């Protein structure tokens, strides 16, 4: 399973590795066995594999000092397209002030691997979407949208564009944690600096770029080979919001002889689907959002507050209460592959940055602890599962992350659903 490679110019711009704390690895193989305990750094014990991908492996880990579970990403040092250090660099660039970002506890070598230790989060929006019979109510979508606009604004404020919007990359917090209602953004493996760190200027507009992102949600301009900027992240979010409301998008399930032709068909269908048709039977604000983001100039800074207000005003007009009572609250979450049950006291650290997020949550805790990856490029470990989340990776010139991937490793079957309207 190939993970999309970064463009050559981005690799050249990547600075040499930062000085890290010295890492300790008890055995260089990077795998566990009964003969010894594999450690990453001074205090992170490596447990069982809970996911894998071209980057390497995702392991369950434990902080022996705090007794808390963590996620550990292991990437071979000799990887053909190393990205873990770049992702770590972006996490450090984002800092710890933003709400809804996973804590990064450690990065360093571990034998033949580079290892990154991250906060363990809950299930992804895609998993929760399945749990809710593949449709969300308007209230749930608006609570998600208001939060994710703030997440993306924060990412952009740190001179980064995300370029990988998909439900698998947005996770709620862990069960029993006071921030389990917070939507987190994860996996910055495809992120890019849109402000050149040397010139401090916006990157230039370019065409004939290879596709980077997830075909189902990416912007129309990305399909056309145009360099991505802030506008493209917001358009991809809009497509994802409509996916949640409708249950599916008009460009899903298209067939073609080759992957390149398939992605071309997806892009053509997006362009030929009027916004009014895409948003039919839903509030006009959804169409207004998409019209606004699609009209943005490549260099233009989006008016995030205008877009948030668009949704908050609709939220209030509908008489909703921002109580975090999402559609999945109260539903039993199936035990995922690689799940562990932990103390309710094992808490994650998140940051509050917007006043509406300070309101107390009235939701009930989810019943089962979920071990989630912090990378959307993972397969279900169970090879017998009927639903495969493996990405279909195109040829080198088409850097596309396929439509459906799983963060929480549920054993499940994908249900065929018609469009549903709430």
Swiss-Prot record:
The keyword NAD does not apply. It catalyses: L-seryl-[protein] + ATP = O-phospho-L-seryl-[protein] + ADP + H(+); L-threonyl-[protein] + ATP = O-phospho-L-threonyl-[protein] + ADP + H(+). Repressed by 2-(2-hydroxyethylamino)-6-(3-chloroanilino)-9-isopropylpurine (DB08325). The modification Phosphoserine is found at residue 344. Its EC number is 2.7.11.1. The active site is at 164 (proton acceptor). It is an enzyme of class 2 (transferase). GO terms for biological process: endocytosis; positive regulation of canonical Wnt signaling pathway; signal transduction; Wnt signaling pathway. GO terms for cellular component: cytoplasm; cytosol; nucleus; plasma membrane. Residues 1-36, 351-389 are annotated as: Disordered. Transmembrane segments: none annotated. One of its GO terms (molecular function) is protein serine kinase activity. Changing residue 230 to W: Found in a patient with non-syndromic early-onset epilepsy associated with severe developmental delay and microcephaly; uncertain significance. Monomer. Belongs to the protein kinase superfamily. CK1 Ser/Thr protein kinase family. Casein kinase I subfamily. This is Casein kinase I isoform gamma-1.
């Amino acid at each position: 399973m190939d993970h999309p490679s970064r463009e050559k110019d981005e690799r050249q711009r990547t600075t040499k590795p930062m000085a890290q704390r010295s890492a300790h690895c008890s055995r260089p193989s990077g795998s566990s066995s009964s003969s010894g305990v594999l450690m990453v750094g001074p205090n992170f014990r490596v447990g069982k594999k809970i996911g894998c991908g071209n980057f390497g492996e995702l392991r369950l880990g434990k902080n022996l000092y705090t007794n808390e579970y963590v996620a550990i990403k292991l990437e071979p040092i000799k990887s053909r397209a190393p990205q873990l250090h770049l992702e770590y660099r972006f996490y450090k660039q984002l800092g710890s002030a933003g709400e809804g970002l996973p804590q990064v506890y450690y990065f360093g070598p571990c034998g033949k691997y580079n290892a990154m230790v991250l906060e363990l989060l809950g299930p992804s929006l895609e998993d929760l979407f399945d749990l809710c019979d593949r449709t969300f109510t308007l209230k749930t979508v608006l609570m998600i949208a208001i939060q994710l606009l703030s997440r993306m604004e924060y990412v952009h404020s740190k001179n980064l564009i995300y370029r990988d919007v998909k439900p698998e990359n947005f996770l709620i917090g862990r069960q029993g944690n006071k921030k389990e209602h917070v939507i987190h953004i994860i996996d910055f493996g495809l992120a890019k600096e849109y402000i050149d760190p040397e010139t401090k200027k916006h990157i230039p507009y370019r065409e004939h770029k290879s596709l980077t992102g997830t075909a189902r949600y990416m912007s129309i301009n990305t399909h056309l080979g145009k360099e991505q900027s802030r506008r493209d992240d917001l358009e991809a979010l809009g497509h994802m919001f409509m996916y949640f409301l409708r249950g599916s998008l008009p460009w899903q399930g298209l067939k073609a002889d080759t992957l390149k032709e398939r992605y071309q068909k997806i892009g053509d269908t997006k362009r030929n689907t009027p916004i009014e048709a895409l948003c039919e039977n839903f509030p006009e604000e959804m169409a207004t959002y998409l019209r606004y983001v699609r009209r943005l100039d490549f260099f233009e800074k989006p008016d995030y507050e205008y877009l948030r207000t668009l949704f908050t005003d609709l939220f209030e007009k509908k008489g909703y209460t921002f109580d975090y009572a999402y559609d999945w609250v109260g539903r039993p979450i199936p035990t995922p592959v690689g799940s562990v049950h932990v103390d309710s006291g094992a808490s994650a650290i998140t940051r509050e940055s917007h006043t509406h997020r300070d309101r107390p949550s009235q939701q009930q805790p989810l019943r089962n602890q979920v071990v989630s990856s912090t990378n959307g490029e993972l397969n279900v470990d169970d090879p017998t599962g009927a639903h495969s989340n493996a990405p279909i990776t195109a040829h080198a010139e088409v850097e596309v992350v396929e439509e459906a991937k799983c963060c929480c490793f549920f054993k499940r079957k994908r249900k065929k659903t018609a469009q549903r309207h709430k």
